[in-house]
């Protein structure tokens, strides 16, 4: 069966002055998959994410989403596409002056044009969806633990019921138990909501636990994008060190010993 690509990146080039980060980069995200994007420092993982979601205009190349080329759409058409994105930034990016409920309600008021009361009722539903108690909604971001901030930001990313969820280092700063719980939450939401997930990470446990495919950024392009087993077998120095070094071996052993998902 042919896989449906919900995102198609072709010939992407990103430059900052004389420095080139991406050259002729190609990558697909298939419907329903969790795609992990990895690479060494400076390979432009977050730049790629920003280029796809419309926060950065690439110097060259195209980004097609649901069969439409973003750069060719007018502002209204592009807005309709981007409403189908949910984005979780590395540090949550919650507004410090708003309560958690107000943070989640904001896109519902701004984009879905709900009343404040309706938006805040729906925000409480989103809180429950990510495993946070209702009382969390009355708190400010500064009153939350790191794990709670991640979940609150995830609830906001899910506010408009997106088709594609973008995650930028979602387990960064979490302890191992919190990171494992967050990984399982992503899988549960993917299956329950029919999400496609674009996941930038350096967390080997996440790669082994929840990713269907892995894309490795290297040499200014996607060096390989395939299943973990095939990626780990690629004859490349960085890949071999990353997947077969001490941390990689530990992550593989933990995954091998974990109960299999149904």
Feature locations, PLM:
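Helix-to-loop junction immediately C-terminal to a conserved catalytic motif
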Residues: 53
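Conserved ABC ATPase "signature" region
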Residues: 69, 117-135
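Conserved ABC ATPase signature
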Residues: 140-144, 148
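Conserved catalytic motifs of ABC-family nucleotide-binding domains
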Residues: 161
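Catalytic Walker B motif of ABC-type/P-loop ATPase nucleotide-binding domains
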Residues: 165-168
